[in-house]
Amino acid sequence: MKALSKLKAEPGIWMTDAPKPEVGHNDLLIKIRKTAICGTDVHIYKWDEWAQKTIPTPMVVGHEYVGEVVDMGQEVRGFKVGDRVSGEGHITCGHCRNCRAGRVHLCRNTTGVGVNREGAFAEYLVIPAFNAFKIPDNISDELASIFDPFGNAVHTALSFDLVGEDVLITGAGPIGIMAAAVAKHVGARHVVISDVNEYRLELARKMGATRAVNVANEKLEDVIKELGMTEGFDIGLEMSGVPSAFNSMLNNMNHGGKVAMLGIPPSDMAVDWNQVIFKGLVIKGIYGREMFETWYKMASLIQSGLDLNPIITHQYSIDDFQAGFDMMISGQSGKVILNWD
């Protein structure tokens, strides 16, 4: 089958002819329709320090997808051939304490589709049926293909009660922008998102952010005054992994504020802990999606009128995958979709 693989320990990604995966007793075989390029895939493409330590070669990569069930193992229940599905890319062990307690997203033995095992940038993908999520008929293939990153946004944004709150999001990548849309949809008052990429800030404006702030030109403190906020932000969603952005967030949080962190900062990031301690801030780390509460919330948010379509800015045939990666790497895009049909 046709597949995009990381063949060599160097920058790049390659179209290959890979063997069709075999279906185990508890697995689904999914014929891929659409995939989306994730920031993780860009790290793998660039072969940065994280990728060099994490990614085996050769391996089929990719983990954002939608497809159709074409075969299944003999033990599978609840699915049928023809079902349209996406899936949770974190494969969990089922026997650690967190798995047995129902906190599956905190499994300490997690492996990742397209990271530690064969991925979705291929004509066919095998995953455990447990990880598959049926897509409702009124949700498009395009939106279903980005459920994985949308889930990161939903998990982060809904970590705390947002109704009537003032929310600061640092980092206007696709996940940060989707988090802004979620926050407005569920009833936040002011949603302010910051970045230095004007293209993506404009996308955030289209998606409903109260203010999209280019911090190269404008101070958050001035935006707070302009919006009539007298006590700082109630909720912070850190999506950038940039130390200066995180410290700016801490400076502008209200006392008793809550911060959810999805962005991965450098390991040696300096933090002004006085801001955390004396303001009584709560900081929560976010990894992946809650299984499978986040997935049901994603579908319900879209069905209740949340419009994510503006975040999908480019689509390419899989044969033009290089153009898709180039566009994603340029930073002048939202989500980039590769079509396998």
UniProtKB/Swiss-Prot annotation:
Cofactor note text: Binds 2 Zn(2+) ions per subunit.
EC number(s) given by UniProt: 1.1.1.103
Residues noted as binding Zn(2+) 1 in the record, renumbered to the chain: 38, 63-64
Primary location recorded for the protein, binned into one broad class: cytoplasm
Pfam families the record matches: ADH_N, ADH_zinc_N
Pathway in which this enzyme or protein is active: Amino-acid degradation; L-threonine degradation via oxydo-reductase pathway; glycine from L-threonine: step 1/2
Catalytic activity: L-threonine + NAD(+) = (2S)-2-amino-3-oxobutanoate + NADH + H(+)
Top-level EC class: oxidoreductase
Keywords: Cytoplasm, Metal-binding, NAD, Oxidoreductase, Zinc
GO cellular component terms, A-Z: cytoplasm
Residues at the site labelled Important for catalytic activity for the proton relay mechanism but does not participate directly in the coordination of zinc atom: 148
Known cofactor(s): Zn(2+)
Cellular location(s): Cytoplasm
Name of the protein in question: L-threonine 3-dehydrogenase
Organism: Pseudoalteromonas translucida (strain TAC 125)
